[in-house]
């Protein structure tokens, strides 16, 4: 119907509805009088669509109104029940009088829904066209409509007594068939209208067949726009979720806030109309606009900084999320593209770095925060036939990388110590104000802290005072001030000075040597088997990798005799581990007169790549040689030298060191001799490593 030019404007335009700031209020609060009682809304979500039963029954559609005609009753059953608004039975005392002001109903059609920012233009135009038409009687053209459209969805039998030519039932069935996937009978029963409201609205819309048709279209349009859209977001979300599983979004949900994941949660917040997500990019709030943060499904949620109670706007429609903690940028780790701009006067270091990916994606895409995908290939372990070999190769390669760096640092530190000791021996006026340079105990060397302490303690205890010695000569001159029995300590100092000079000479000749490993020999290593068991960790890191248990042949040059020994390096399987051996070592052990407690050191030439071996023999203390010619005493009687200093030196475990250190008695048990040799091996290993 078309509005005449001279008709008065509709009531919805004369008295425009007042839109409050809070759009979350119910429509019933905005309608006064009986209109608040006439409209009842069901906010439950729609289930899956079953087949339509007959939408009306004689028992449920019985009315006790005497004021309504048969035609209006038939219309109520037709438009109310079939249109999805089953009339609510009421007692005769209530009555079904028309609305005092039917304009309230029409205003309601033009009101903005709490989930909608603007009214639907189709509904407003329909109302304007209907109100501009001249009114007609309510019952005109309705006497012949006596049947109630009852039907099942799509092709099934329709329970209707009206003829096929009737426009109203046919229009409703076409609408019902087109929306069969999104609506059910239970959904339609959730919205109720009184008979008086239907009659008054039909009369206001022109009455008769046209008024009834206009009212039915109005109701169905409202149902379709505000209720059928509730289920569509859920379907769209499922489809987009399936797409995102194959090709995930490069930007994940911020880990500090969760948006509604489906259409059901969004409908609970107000039944928003679903629209496809837009690809437009909105700059962050720090640059003057509303910060837009895409969700995992691809929709954009803009955060308004204004004082409005609705803080989230979904597709230009207000949405109130559940209350959460402070959503300021300092407390949340947004993706890197949307890191909030620091406020004026604040340092950029106060903001925490954002997480590279959202926890919701399980860490599968490490580059999600950076805007691109980078999936690391970590399936190489399953390609190998044996996981043990693969793990061993990785471990050995990792240990080699770490050991190379530690070896370089150790060599630099050793050379620095040697140069420092050389400079300290030269007389300088500043030598009295300088102290000894000692390396930090941060794991630079490959010897244990106990052996390092054993090497450093004789130097520190060689001086009776606690003041640190400024040079090796000062340390050697200090014991000379003591009585004659302290000559053993003087011998110890001479041995240390000789070792230091040998070390300086060896550093010049062997500066290209790299220390690999050392091994204190056991009884089985020096026996008739002719093989030496090597430490596993050092062998895997520094020696060549073995493919088979037969091993490889390695020529090793003896540093002491310059003789090349052809030894075989192999391993024995030990459960899931390995035991590395160095075979054909019997001749080398006999030529160097190595015994249990002695040790070997293996080097590698940095330039040529060849391997060198050195056998270090732990010599017995000279005190045992001096006491071997004395008389008296039993077999195990300790022949300690006389004198309080010698006795104190013999009783102090710190002074009982190798290479000519006095204080050891002749009658030591085999366990004591073995312990002394092991201590001497630790001291000699420190010298070997420093070279």
Swiss-Prot record:
Composition-biased stretches (Polar residues): 1-15, 420-437, 448-459
A GO molecular function held by the record: DNA binding
One Pfam family in the UniProt entry: B3
Superkingdom of source: Eukaryota
Tissue: Seed.
Entry-linked InterPro entries: B3_DNA-bd, DNA-bd_pseudobarrel_sf, LEC2-like
GO cellular component: cytoplasm; nucleus
Biased composition regions of type Acidic residues, renumbered to the chain: 31-41
Localization per Swiss-Prot or TrEMBL: Cytoplasm; Nucleus
Main location: cytoplasm
Sequence segments annotated as region (Disordered): 1-95, 135-158, 384-489, 618-691
DNA-binding region: 517-619
Compositional bias (Basic residues): 391-401
BP GO annotations: abscisic acid-activated signaling pathway
CDD domains: BfiI_C_EcoRII_N_B3
Function: Transcriptional activator specifically required for expression of the maturation program in the seed development. Probably potentiates the response to the seed-specific hormone abscisic acid (ABA). May bind to DNA indirectly.
Official protein name in the record: Regulatory protein viviparous-1
Protein source organism: Zea mays
Gene: VP1
